Amino acid sequence: MESSDAKTVLVVDDEPEIRKLVGAMVSRFGHTVLTADSGEHALTLIKHGHPIELLITDVIAPGMSGPMLADKLSALHPGLKVLYISGYDNSHIVKKYVVEKGHALLAKPFTVDALREKIEALLGPVPTTKSV
């Protein structure tokens, strides 16, 4: 892996198991991973100087929704890529938050390969030579 190819990915989910699992997968792909259990926690991380290239967040979350978080982080990091993960397959979510804003959506449950494909579509090839 060439470290210059690695991107920093912020994984935000209020469910610890999902946050840990997605973070582990993204790390195995060769990226640097930051995690947060809420939108508020994510904003604190970013305001303390942690640059990110990709936000992976649930659409529906207590406190601050994924789209609201994405809007706030995009204001701080123009060009931020966003991947929503959701158990809801709702066409208005897809239209409003994915198509109109150029973000991506991955339906739960998903496979490692599906996650890798979405990340590659947003950030380019995953910078690893290891088999995942």
Task: List each model region and its residues.
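Short acidic/polar segment at the start of the alpha1 helix of CheY-like receiver
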Residues: 15-19
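Short hydrophobic/Thr-rich beta-strand motif most characteristic of the beta2 strand and flanking loop
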Residues: 30-37, 45, 106
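Acidic catalytic/metal-coordinating carboxylates
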Residues: 37-41, 65-69
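Receiver (REC) domain active-site loop signature in two-component systems and cognate sites
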Residues: 61
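Alpha4 helix (beta4-alpha4-beta5 surface) of REC/receiver domains from two-component response regulators
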Residues: 68, 72-75, 80-107, 113-120
